[in-house]
Amino acid sequence: MAADSQDIYRNLSADDYEAAPIVVDSVCPVCEEDGETRIMCTSIPYYRAVILMSFECPHCGHKNNEIQSGEAVQEHGTLIVLRVQKPEDLRRQLVKSEYASIEVPELQLEIPHKSQPGEVTTVEGVLERVHRGLSQDQEKRRLLDPEGASQIDAYLQKITSCMELGETWTLRLRDPTGNCYIQNPDVRHVDPRCIISHYHRNLDERKLLALADDNEEEEEVEPSAAAPEFKSYEDAKQEVLHFATDCPNCHGPTEVKMKPTDIPFFQTVIIMSLACDRCGYKSNEVKSGGAIRDQGCRMSVKLEKDLDLARDVLKTDTCALSIPEIDLEVGGNALCGRFTTIEGLLTATKEQLDAQSSFFMGDSAQTGEKSAVTTFLEKLDDIIALRLPATIILDDPTGCSYVQSLTAPMDDPRLTKEFYTRTYEQNDELGINDMKVENYGELDALAEEDEPHEA
Protein backbone atom coordinates (compact mmCIF):
# COMPACT_ATOMS: atom_id res chain seq x y z
CA MET A 1 0.00 0.00 0.00
CA ALA A 2 2.86 2.37 0.84
CA ALA A 3 4.54 1.60 -2.47
CA ASP A 4 1.34 2.30 -4.40
CA SER A 5 0.96 5.62 -2.58
CA GLN A 6 4.52 6.60 -3.57
CA ASP A 7 3.82 5.74 -7.22
CA ILE A 8 0.65 7.87 -7.25
CA TYR A 9 2.00 10.97 -5.51
CA ARG A 10 5.21 11.78 -7.37
CA ASN A 11 7.55 14.66 -6.65
CA LEU A 12 7.33 17.56 -9.09
CA SER A 13 10.24 17.24 -11.54
CA ALA A 14 10.78 18.15 -15.18
CA ASP A 15 12.91 15.00 -15.58
CA ASP A 16 10.10 12.63 -14.55
CA TYR A 17 8.45 11.84 -17.87
CA GLU A 18 6.24 9.13 -16.35
CA ALA A 19 4.43 11.65 -14.13
CA ALA A 20 1.99 12.57 -16.88
CA PRO A 21 -1.45 13.84 -15.85
CA ILE A 22 -4.59 11.73 -16.27
CA VAL A 23 -6.92 13.15 -18.95
CA VAL A 24 -10.68 12.79 -18.41
CA ASP A 25 -13.51 14.06 -20.64
CA SER A 26 -16.01 16.19 -18.72
CA VAL A 27 -18.89 18.56 -19.40
CA CYS A 28 -18.18 22.29 -19.50
CA PRO A 29 -20.33 24.09 -16.87
CA VAL A 30 -20.61 27.17 -19.14
CA CYS A 31 -21.49 25.93 -22.63
CA GLU A 32 -22.29 22.30 -21.69
CA GLU A 33 -20.01 21.00 -24.45
CA ASP A 34 -17.34 18.35 -23.91
CA GLY A 35 -14.21 19.69 -22.22
CA GLU A 36 -11.05 18.13 -20.88
CA THR A 37 -9.94 17.73 -17.26
CA ARG A 38 -6.33 16.93 -16.43
CA ILE A 39 -5.66 15.32 -13.04
CA MET A 40 -2.23 14.86 -11.51
CA CYS A 41 -1.32 13.54 -8.05
CA THR A 42 1.92 15.02 -6.80
CA SER A 43 3.89 15.83 -3.67
CA ILE A 44 4.75 19.46 -2.88
CA PRO A 45 8.08 19.95 -1.05
CA TYR A 46 7.71 20.81 2.64
CA TYR A 47 3.97 20.37 2.25
CA ARG A 48 1.97 17.25 1.52
CA ALA A 49 0.48 15.12 -1.20
CA VAL A 50 -2.05 17.02 -3.31
CA ILE A 51 -4.34 16.40 -6.28
CA LEU A 52 -4.07 19.03 -9.04
CA MET A 53 -6.98 19.43 -11.45
CA SER A 54 -7.14 21.64 -14.53
CA PHE A 55 -10.18 22.00 -16.81
CA GLU A 56 -10.24 23.63 -20.26
CA CYS A 57 -13.06 23.84 -22.79
CA PRO A 58 -11.97 24.12 -26.45
CA HIS A 59 -15.42 25.43 -27.47
CA CYS A 60 -15.93 28.48 -25.22
CA GLY A 61 -12.44 28.82 -23.76
CA HIS A 62 -13.56 28.40 -20.14
CA LYS A 63 -10.69 27.41 -17.81
CA ASN A 64 -10.59 26.36 -14.18
CA ASN A 65 -7.84 25.14 -11.86
CA GLU A 66 -8.25 23.47 -8.48
CA ILE A 67 -6.17 21.73 -5.85
CA GLN A 68 -7.38 19.19 -3.31
CA SER A 69 -5.41 17.77 -0.42
CA GLY A 70 -4.42 14.15 -0.78
CA GLU A 71 -3.61 13.94 2.92
CA ALA A 72 -5.72 13.30 5.97
CA VAL A 73 -6.87 16.15 8.19
CA GLN A 74 -4.01 17.08 10.53
CA GLU A 75 -4.13 16.77 14.31
CA HIS A 76 -4.52 20.53 14.81
CA GLY A 77 -5.65 23.49 12.75
CA THR A 78 -3.05 26.00 11.53
CA LEU A 79 -3.03 29.80 11.77
CA ILE A 80 -0.38 31.71 9.80
CA VAL A 81 0.04 35.48 10.20
CA LEU A 82 2.31 37.18 7.65
CA ARG A 83 3.38 40.81 7.77
CA VAL A 84 3.90 41.88 4.13
CA GLN A 85 6.62 44.54 4.01
CA LYS A 86 9.02 43.66 1.16
CA PRO A 87 8.69 42.60 -2.51
CA GLU A 88 9.91 39.09 -1.68
CA ASP A 89 6.94 38.72 0.69
CA LEU A 90 4.59 39.13 -2.28
CA ARG A 91 6.40 36.31 -4.12
CA ARG A 92 6.08 33.78 -1.28
CA GLN A 93 4.33 30.59 -2.33
CA LEU A 94 1.03 30.00 -0.53
CA VAL A 95 -0.83 26.70 -0.30
CA LYS A 96 -4.32 26.44 1.13
CA SER A 97 -7.24 24.03 1.16
CA GLU A 98 -10.84 24.85 0.31
CA TYR A 99 -11.61 24.97 4.05
CA ALA A 100 -9.15 27.82 4.67
CA SER A 101 -10.22 31.40 5.35
CA ILE A 102 -8.11 34.47 4.57
CA GLU A 103 -8.27 37.87 6.21
CA VAL A 104 -6.53 41.18 5.44
CA PRO A 105 -7.49 43.57 8.30
CA GLU A 106 -6.09 46.68 6.58
CA LEU A 107 -8.51 46.18 3.67
CA GLN A 108 -11.35 44.86 5.85
CA LEU A 109 -11.17 41.87 3.50
CA GLU A 110 -12.32 38.43 4.57
CA ILE A 111 -12.47 35.39 2.28
CA PRO A 112 -14.59 32.76 4.09
CA HIS A 113 -13.99 29.03 3.93
CA LYS A 114 -15.29 27.07 0.92
CA SER A 115 -15.80 30.29 -1.07
CA GLN A 116 -12.71 29.42 -3.14
CA PRO A 117 -11.19 26.08 -4.13
CA GLY A 118 -7.90 24.93 -2.69
CA GLU A 119 -4.97 26.29 -4.65
CA VAL A 120 -1.24 26.87 -4.89
CA THR A 121 -0.60 30.56 -5.47
CA THR A 122 1.47 33.45 -4.11
CA VAL A 123 0.70 36.08 -1.49
CA GLU A 124 0.29 38.62 -4.29
CA GLY A 125 -1.92 36.15 -6.16
CA VAL A 126 -4.46 36.23 -3.31
CA LEU A 127 -5.06 39.97 -3.84
CA GLU A 128 -4.87 39.63 -7.63
CA ARG A 129 -7.73 37.13 -7.56
CA VAL A 130 -9.87 39.47 -5.44
CA HIS A 131 -8.99 42.42 -7.72
CA ARG A 132 -9.85 40.41 -10.83
CA GLY A 133 -13.16 39.22 -9.38
CA LEU A 134 -14.30 42.73 -8.39
CA SER A 135 -13.24 44.22 -11.74
CA GLN A 136 -15.23 41.79 -13.90
CA ASP A 137 -18.60 43.58 -14.04
CA GLN A 138 -17.48 47.14 -13.35
CA GLU A 139 -18.63 48.43 -16.76
CA LYS A 140 -22.17 47.18 -16.12
CA ARG A 141 -22.15 48.60 -12.60
CA ARG A 142 -21.18 52.05 -13.87
CA LEU A 143 -24.36 52.04 -15.97
CA LEU A 144 -26.73 50.46 -13.44
CA ASP A 145 -25.24 51.60 -10.11
CA PRO A 146 -22.72 54.45 -10.54
CA GLU A 147 -22.39 55.05 -6.80
CA GLY A 148 -21.66 51.39 -6.04
CA ALA A 149 -19.18 51.25 -8.93
CA SER A 150 -17.28 54.27 -7.60
CA GLN A 151 -17.03 52.66 -4.15
CA ILE A 152 -15.64 49.48 -5.71
CA ASP A 153 -13.16 51.57 -7.75
CA ALA A 154 -11.91 53.16 -4.53
CA TYR A 155 -11.57 49.73 -2.94
CA LEU A 156 -9.68 48.42 -6.00
CA GLN A 157 -7.23 51.30 -5.60
CA LYS A 158 -6.58 50.20 -2.01
CA ILE A 159 -5.90 46.65 -3.21
CA THR A 160 -3.52 47.97 -5.88
CA SER A 161 -1.73 50.06 -3.26
CA CYS A 162 -1.20 46.95 -1.12
CA MET A 163 0.11 44.96 -4.11
CA GLU A 164 2.54 47.80 -4.86
CA LEU A 165 3.54 47.92 -1.15
CA GLY A 166 2.31 51.46 -0.77
CA GLU A 167 1.62 50.42 2.81
CA THR A 168 2.45 47.50 5.06
CA TRP A 169 -0.37 44.98 5.42
CA THR A 170 -1.13 41.71 7.19
CA LEU A 171 -2.38 38.41 5.77
CA ARG A 172 -4.02 35.93 8.16
CA LEU A 173 -4.45 32.39 6.84
CA ARG A 174 -6.54 30.07 9.04
CA ASP A 175 -7.05 26.47 7.95
CA PRO A 176 -8.84 24.00 10.27
CA THR A 177 -7.45 21.05 8.25
CA GLY A 178 -3.87 22.08 9.06
CA ASN A 179 -3.04 21.69 5.36
CA CYS A 180 -1.81 25.21 4.62
CA TYR A 181 1.61 26.73 4.12
CA ILE A 182 3.39 30.01 3.38
CA GLN A 183 6.96 29.75 2.13
CA ASN A 184 9.93 31.00 4.17
CA PRO A 185 12.36 32.71 1.73
CA ASP A 186 15.38 31.82 3.90
CA VAL A 187 15.22 28.30 5.30
CA ARG A 188 18.29 28.79 7.53
CA HIS A 189 16.91 31.63 9.63
CA VAL A 190 13.83 32.44 11.66
CA ASP A 191 11.16 34.09 9.53
CA PRO A 192 10.90 37.55 11.15
CA ARG A 193 7.63 38.50 9.47
CA CYS A 194 5.67 35.23 9.70
CA ILE A 195 4.15 33.57 12.77
CA ILE A 196 2.81 30.00 12.58
CA SER A 197 0.66 28.60 15.38
CA HIS A 198 -1.47 25.49 15.80
CA TYR A 199 -4.78 25.33 17.63
CA HIS A 200 -7.52 22.92 18.66
CA ARG A 201 -10.51 23.05 16.34
CA ASN A 202 -13.78 24.31 17.79
CA LEU A 203 -17.10 22.52 17.31
CA ASP A 204 -18.09 24.52 14.20
CA GLU A 205 -14.80 23.66 12.51
CA ARG A 206 -15.16 19.99 13.40
CA LYS A 207 -18.65 20.02 11.85
CA LEU A 208 -17.25 21.73 8.74
CA LEU A 209 -14.73 18.90 8.31
CA ALA A 210 -17.35 16.22 9.09
CA LEU A 211 -15.45 15.27 12.24
CA ALA A 212 -18.56 15.91 14.34
CA ASP A 213 -22.26 15.32 13.80
CA ASP A 214 -24.30 18.32 12.65
CA ASN A 215 -26.57 17.95 15.68
CA GLU A 216 -23.73 17.66 18.18
CA GLU A 217 -23.52 20.33 20.87
CA GLU A 218 -20.79 21.33 23.29
CA GLU A 219 -21.05 19.20 26.40
CA GLU A 220 -20.28 20.49 29.85
CA VAL A 221 -17.92 18.07 31.52
CA GLU A 222 -19.01 17.30 35.06
CA PRO A 223 -16.47 16.04 37.57
CA SER A 224 -16.80 12.34 38.10
CA ALA A 225 -17.80 11.15 41.53
CA ALA A 226 -15.27 8.33 41.17
CA ALA A 227 -12.38 10.68 40.44
CA PRO A 228 -9.52 10.20 42.90
CA GLU A 229 -8.92 12.85 45.52
CA PHE A 230 -5.29 13.79 46.06
CA LYS A 231 -4.19 15.07 49.44
CA SER A 232 -1.08 16.75 48.05
CA TYR A 233 0.70 17.59 44.82
CA GLU A 234 3.23 14.83 45.54
CA ASP A 235 0.39 12.29 45.58
CA ALA A 236 -0.84 13.56 42.22
CA LYS A 237 2.64 13.19 40.71
CA GLN A 238 2.58 9.46 41.43
CA GLU A 239 -0.66 8.93 39.48
CA VAL A 240 -0.98 8.46 35.70
CA LEU A 241 -3.96 10.56 34.63
CA HIS A 242 -6.24 9.51 31.76
CA PHE A 243 -8.21 11.90 29.54
CA ALA A 244 -10.74 10.88 26.88
CA THR A 245 -10.11 12.36 23.42
CA ASP A 246 -10.44 11.63 19.70
CA CYS A 247 -7.58 10.07 17.74
CA PRO A 248 -6.15 12.69 15.32
CA ASN A 249 -5.56 9.95 12.74
CA CYS A 250 -8.74 7.83 12.62
CA HIS A 251 -10.92 10.17 14.78
CA GLY A 252 -12.04 7.25 16.92
CA PRO A 253 -12.32 7.43 20.74
CA THR A 254 -9.06 6.98 22.61
CA GLU A 255 -7.32 8.47 25.65
CA VAL A 256 -4.31 10.61 26.52
CA LYS A 257 -2.11 9.56 29.42
CA MET A 258 -0.37 12.28 31.43
CA LYS A 259 2.10 12.13 34.30
CA PRO A 260 4.28 14.75 36.03
CA THR A 261 7.95 13.71 36.26
CA ASP A 262 10.87 15.31 38.08
CA ILE A 263 14.10 15.98 36.17
CA PRO A 264 17.16 15.90 38.49
CA PHE A 265 18.70 19.33 39.12
CA PHE A 266 15.85 20.96 37.18
CA GLN A 267 12.10 21.00 37.70
CA THR A 268 8.92 19.04 37.08
CA VAL A 269 7.81 18.32 33.51
CA ILE A 270 4.57 16.84 32.21
CA ILE A 271 4.82 13.86 29.86
CA MET A 272 1.80 13.16 27.65
CA SER A 273 1.33 10.17 25.36
CA LEU A 274 -1.41 8.90 23.09
CA ALA A 275 -1.74 5.38 21.65
CA CYS A 276 -4.82 4.52 19.60
CA ASP A 277 -5.92 0.88 19.82
CA ARG A 278 -7.94 1.15 16.60
CA CYS A 279 -5.35 2.42 14.10
CA GLY A 280 -2.07 2.18 16.04
CA TYR A 281 -1.32 5.92 15.91
CA LYS A 282 1.11 7.09 18.61
CA SER A 283 2.35 10.50 19.73
CA ASN A 284 4.37 11.85 22.64
CA GLU A 285 4.84 15.36 23.94
CA VAL A 286 6.60 17.03 26.86
CA LYS A 287 5.49 20.26 28.52
CA SER A 288 7.10 22.30 31.26
CA GLY A 289 5.36 21.74 34.57
CA GLY A 290 6.51 24.94 36.20
CA ALA A 291 5.66 28.60 35.92
CA ILE A 292 7.46 31.05 33.65
CA ARG A 293 10.75 31.90 35.33
CA ASP A 294 11.64 35.43 36.40
CA GLN A 295 14.45 35.46 33.81
CA GLY A 296 15.08 33.88 30.45
CA CYS A 297 17.87 31.33 30.03
CA ARG A 298 20.43 30.94 27.24
CA MET A 299 22.33 27.62 27.24
CA SER A 300 25.42 26.96 25.09
CA VAL A 301 26.80 23.45 24.56
CA LYS A 302 30.14 22.79 22.87
CA LEU A 303 29.86 19.62 20.78
CA GLU A 304 33.23 17.87 21.06
CA LYS A 305 32.52 14.30 22.22
CA ASP A 306 29.92 11.58 21.77
CA LEU A 307 28.74 12.27 25.31
CA ASP A 308 27.74 15.79 24.25
CA LEU A 309 25.42 14.40 21.57
CA ALA A 310 23.87 12.03 24.15
CA ARG A 311 22.94 14.82 26.60
CA ASP A 312 19.25 14.90 27.55
CA VAL A 313 17.43 18.00 26.32
CA LEU A 314 14.04 19.41 27.26
CA LYS A 315 13.00 21.92 24.61
CA THR A 316 9.83 23.91 25.19
CA ASP A 317 7.68 25.44 22.45
CA THR A 318 9.17 28.87 23.11
CA CYS A 319 12.83 27.79 22.93
CA ALA A 320 14.85 28.93 19.89
CA LEU A 321 17.89 27.08 18.54
CA SER A 322 20.96 28.48 16.80
CA ILE A 323 24.38 27.27 15.61
CA PRO A 324 26.67 30.27 14.90
CA GLU A 325 29.29 28.21 13.00
CA ILE A 326 26.87 27.56 10.12
CA ASP A 327 24.68 30.65 10.60
CA LEU A 328 21.59 28.60 11.54
CA GLU A 329 18.60 30.00 13.42
CA VAL A 330 15.44 28.03 14.23
CA GLY A 331 12.51 29.80 15.91
CA GLY A 332 10.77 28.64 19.02
CA ASN A 333 7.59 27.38 17.32
CA ALA A 334 9.41 25.59 14.49
CA LEU A 335 9.79 22.39 16.52
CA CYS A 336 7.22 21.38 19.12
CA GLY A 337 8.16 20.80 22.75
CA ARG A 338 10.08 17.56 23.18
CA PHE A 339 12.33 15.61 25.53
CA THR A 340 15.17 14.13 23.49
CA THR A 341 18.97 14.27 23.12
CA ILE A 342 21.24 16.82 21.45
CA GLU A 343 21.66 14.41 18.54
CA GLY A 344 17.91 13.83 18.30
CA LEU A 345 17.25 17.57 18.31
CA LEU A 346 19.82 18.20 15.55
CA THR A 347 18.46 15.30 13.49
CA ALA A 348 14.87 16.59 13.77
CA THR A 349 16.07 20.07 12.77
CA LYS A 350 17.94 18.68 9.75
CA GLU A 351 14.92 16.66 8.60
CA GLN A 352 12.71 19.73 8.72
CA LEU A 353 15.26 21.93 6.94
CA ASP A 354 15.89 19.19 4.37
CA ALA A 355 12.19 19.02 3.54
CA GLN A 356 11.80 22.80 3.48
CA SER A 357 14.88 23.28 1.29
CA SER A 358 13.18 21.32 -1.48
CA PHE A 359 11.64 24.64 -2.53
CA PHE A 360 15.20 25.78 -3.34
CA MET A 361 16.26 22.53 -5.03
CA GLY A 362 13.57 22.38 -7.74
CA ASP A 363 13.90 22.90 -11.47
CA SER A 364 13.30 26.65 -11.25
CA ALA A 365 15.90 27.23 -8.52
CA GLN A 366 19.10 29.06 -9.36
CA THR A 367 22.38 27.12 -9.38
CA GLY A 368 23.82 29.26 -6.57
CA GLU A 369 20.83 28.55 -4.32
CA LYS A 370 21.07 24.80 -4.92
CA SER A 371 24.78 24.61 -4.09
CA ALA A 372 24.38 26.84 -1.00
CA VAL A 373 21.58 24.68 0.44
CA THR A 374 23.46 21.45 -0.35
CA THR A 375 26.62 22.75 1.33
CA PHE A 376 24.63 23.90 4.36
CA LEU A 377 22.99 20.49 4.88
CA GLU A 378 26.37 18.76 4.48
CA LYS A 379 27.81 20.97 7.23
CA LEU A 380 24.91 20.04 9.50
CA ASP A 381 25.66 16.35 8.84
CA ASP A 382 29.31 17.00 9.75
CA ILE A 383 28.23 18.57 13.06
CA ILE A 384 26.04 15.56 13.92
CA ALA A 385 28.98 13.25 13.07
CA LEU A 386 31.37 15.45 15.16
CA ARG A 387 33.53 16.12 12.10
CA LEU A 388 32.89 19.86 12.47
CA PRO A 389 33.27 21.48 15.92
CA ALA A 390 30.26 23.60 16.76
CA THR A 391 28.28 25.20 19.57
CA ILE A 392 24.52 24.73 19.88
CA ILE A 393 22.66 27.54 21.64
CA LEU A 394 19.21 27.08 23.17
CA ASP A 395 17.53 30.37 24.07
CA ASP A 396 14.29 30.11 26.05
CA PRO A 397 12.70 33.38 27.25
CA THR A 398 10.55 31.41 29.73
CA GLY A 399 13.63 29.79 31.30
CA CYS A 400 11.90 26.38 31.27
CA SER A 401 14.18 24.48 28.87
CA TYR A 402 16.86 22.12 30.12
CA VAL A 403 20.18 20.61 28.99
CA GLN A 404 21.72 17.78 31.00
CA SER A 405 24.93 18.57 32.85
CA LEU A 406 27.50 15.75 32.74
CA THR A 407 29.13 16.87 35.99
CA ALA A 408 26.12 18.00 38.09
CA PRO A 409 26.08 19.45 40.66
CA MET A 410 29.58 20.67 39.68
CA ASP A 411 30.15 23.09 36.79
CA ASP A 412 30.22 21.53 33.32
CA PRO A 413 33.14 22.92 31.24
CA ARG A 414 31.26 22.46 27.94
CA LEU A 415 27.87 23.74 29.15
CA THR A 416 27.30 27.44 29.77
CA LYS A 417 24.12 28.94 31.23
CA GLU A 418 23.31 32.62 31.02
CA PHE A 419 20.26 34.19 32.65
CA TYR A 420 18.93 37.46 31.25
CA THR A 421 16.06 39.89 31.70
CA ARG A 422 13.37 39.56 29.03
CA THR A 423 12.61 42.49 26.74
CA TYR A 424 9.20 44.14 26.66
CA GLU A 425 8.50 42.46 23.30
CA GLN A 426 9.29 39.01 24.73
CA ASN A 427 7.03 39.60 27.73
CA ASP A 428 4.30 40.81 25.39
CA GLU A 429 4.60 37.67 23.25
CA LEU A 430 4.29 35.52 26.37
CA GLY A 431 1.29 37.53 27.57
CA ILE A 432 3.04 38.67 30.75
CA ASN A 433 2.52 42.40 30.17
CA ASP A 434 -1.26 41.98 30.48
CA MET A 435 -1.10 39.87 33.64
CA LYS A 436 -1.83 41.19 37.11
CA VAL A 437 0.50 39.15 39.30
CA GLU A 438 0.12 41.10 42.55
CA ASN A 439 -3.10 41.61 44.56
CA TYR A 440 -4.99 39.83 41.79
CA GLY A 441 -7.69 38.91 44.29
CA GLU A 442 -8.66 42.57 44.57
CA LEU A 443 -9.55 43.25 40.94
CA ASP A 444 -12.09 46.02 40.45
CA ALA A 445 -14.58 46.11 37.62
CA LEU A 446 -13.25 48.23 34.77
CA ALA A 447 -15.65 50.57 32.98
CA GLU A 448 -15.37 50.97 29.22
CA GLU A 449 -14.06 54.34 28.09
CA ASP A 450 -17.02 54.91 25.80
CA GLU A 451 -19.55 53.75 28.39
CA PRO A 452 -21.70 56.70 29.56
CA HIS A 453 -21.38 57.41 33.27
CA GLU A 454 -24.54 57.63 35.29
CA ALA A 455 -25.27 61.05 36.75
From Swiss-Prot:
Subcellular location: Nucleus
GO cellular component, one term: sarcomere
UniProt keyword Endoplasmic reticulum, yes or no: no
Alphabetically ordered keywords of this record: Metal-binding, Nucleus, Repeat, Zinc, Zinc-finger
Residue spans, zinc finger C4-type: 28-60, 247-279
Gene Ontology annotations of biological process type: protein folding
GO MF entry, a single one: protein folding chaperone
Chief place where the protein resides: nucleus
Family, per entry: Belongs to the ZPR1 family.
Matches recorded under PANTHER family: ZINC FINGER PROTEIN ZPR1
Name this polypeptide is given: Zinc finger protein ZPR1 homolog
